[in-house]
């Protein structure tokens, strides 16, 4: 009654599909309209694992993220296999080996996995994404976020990117053109739902790369981000750049992929059978089920309604107005005046407190008390005048000086 698959049904399998059957698999309905029309004739209900919305409640069944995570990791492994040098820099008796420079285009799940893997292997990692809110994620993983000086936000719906304007693409190409000659490994991961993969690394960029460089195109199955990518093949260009267009990267880690995908599909079945009676119920009011359902009893329900939640962009490329020397000088004078007033108030309070204690305390106590106050003041001045950069490596010395003065 229910068929669980990885890839969409093939033509040779159509004859085996029964009327009214339930199919759960990757479908890619945006690129496979003919497939939807063929399945419609069978009056089947189809949940596309690639159409599950990117919301928190659906993470447990988000097969795209699971497979993208594996693909991003494996992309770095495949690149390292074809790359002729170390990822990390080394200084040996035979000479100095520079670290590999890796550029990751697209900082989704696959991109972040690739960044983390390359960074852990010692490479210098740079990353680019049209969505400004991912800059913090990239930098938190130790990579450099390549910022475009362009007032535009590429954030789309459901956590994906949206198509960019011609002006933005022009600026983007200028950035990549500057990066291409010095980058050793390029990993492209950019996809737009329901559309062919955007062309982000044209043949011109490939020609600018050094001999021995490697390009891994994770969007090869959807047309590729690189002009010269051939799906399912690895080619070498005239200038000795290797371009990897494998579309089965998750299958190259079959055990891990099977475990994650089976968990995703199990959670999908759990949501389809809320009564736990084994009978699937397609609740079209449920955002997750509605988003994944592309055929319902033979009726095409693709595309789903737009997601209600859109990521809030963080504009990190806003220019900060620089202060003039006059403004800086004025602020400094104001700060000194404020500090002076505060010190005067504290001295008056301290003097009053000392006088009050002296009225009732024994003479011996007052002698010790005054010495203690003076030692605190001297200690404060000594420690405060130590350069800030020395405090951390010399923390033991700093503490020792403080203790000696107090004693």
Segment roles from a protein language model:
Residues 50-92, 99, 220, 226-316, ...:
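Adenosine-phosphate binding glycine-rich loop
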Residues 1, 8-9, 156-186, 190-203, ...:
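A structured beta-alpha segment of the ubiquitous adenosine-cofactor-binding alpha/beta core
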Residues 173, 326-353:
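Membrane-water interface at loop-to-transmembrane-helix junctions
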Residues 2-77:
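Phosphate/diphosphate ligand-binding glycine-rich loop within oxidoreductases
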Residues 363-375:
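Structural signature of hydrophobic alpha-helical transmembrane segments
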Residues 369-371, 392-403:
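Cytoplasmic-side transmembrane-helix entry/capping segments in multi-pass membrane proteins
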Residues 88-179, 332-336:
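Glycine-rich phosphate/diphosphate-binding loop of Rossmann-like nucleotide-binding domains
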Residues 18-50, 185-236, 240-244:
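ADP-ribose/adenylate-binding Rossmann-like module
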């Amino acid at each position: 009654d229910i068929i669980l698959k990885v890839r969409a049904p093939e033509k040779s399998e159509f004859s085996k599909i029964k009327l009214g059957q339930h199919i759960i698999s990757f479908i890619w309905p945006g690129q496979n309209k003919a497939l939807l029309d063929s399945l419609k004739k069978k009056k089947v209900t189809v949940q596309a694992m690639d159409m599950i919305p990117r919301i928190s409640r659906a993470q447990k069944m988000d097969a795209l993220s699971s497979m993208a995570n594996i693909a991003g990791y494996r992309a770095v492994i495949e690149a390292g296999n074809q790359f002729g040098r170390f990822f990390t820099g080394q200084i040996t008796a035979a000479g100095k080996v520079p670290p590999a420079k890796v550029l990751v285009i697209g900082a989704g799940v696959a991109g972040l996995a690739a960044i983390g893997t390359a960074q852990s292997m010692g490479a210098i990692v740079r990353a680019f994404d049209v969505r400004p809110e991912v800059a913090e994620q990239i930098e938190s993983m130790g990579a450099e976020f390549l910022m475009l000086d362009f007032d535009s936000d590429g954030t789309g719906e459901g956590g994906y990117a949206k198509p960019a304007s011609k002006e933005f693409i022009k600026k983007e190409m200028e950035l990549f053109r500057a990066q291409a000659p010095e980058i050793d490994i390029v990993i492209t991961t950019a996809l737009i739902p329901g559309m062919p993969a955007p062309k982000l690394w044209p043949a011109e960029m490939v020609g600018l790369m050094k001999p021995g460089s490697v390009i891994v195109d994770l969007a090869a199955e959807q047309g590729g981000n690189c002009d010269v990518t051939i799906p399912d093949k690895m080619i070498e260009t005239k200038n000795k750049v290797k371009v990897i267009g494998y579309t089965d990267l998750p299958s190259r880690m079959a055990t891990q992929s099977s475990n994650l995908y089976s968990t995703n599909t199990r959670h999908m079945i759990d949501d389809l059978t809320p009564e736990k009676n084994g009978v699937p119920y397609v609740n079209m009011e449920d955002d997750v089920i509605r988003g994944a359902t592309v055929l319902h009893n033979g009726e095409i329900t693709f595309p789903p309604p737009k997601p209600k939640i859109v990521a809030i962009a963080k504009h990190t490329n806003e220019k900060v107005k620089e202060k003039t020397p006059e403004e800086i000088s004025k602020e400094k004078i104001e700060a000194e005046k404020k500090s002076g007033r505060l010190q005067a108030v504290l001295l008056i309070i301290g003097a009053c407190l000392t006088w009050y204690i002296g009225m009732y305390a024994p003479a011996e106590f007052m002698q010790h008390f005054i010495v203690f106050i003076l030692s605190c003041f001297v200690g404060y001045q000594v420690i405060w005048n130590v350069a800030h950069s020395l405090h951390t490596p010399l923390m033991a010395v700093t503490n020792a000086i403080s203790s000696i003065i107090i004693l």
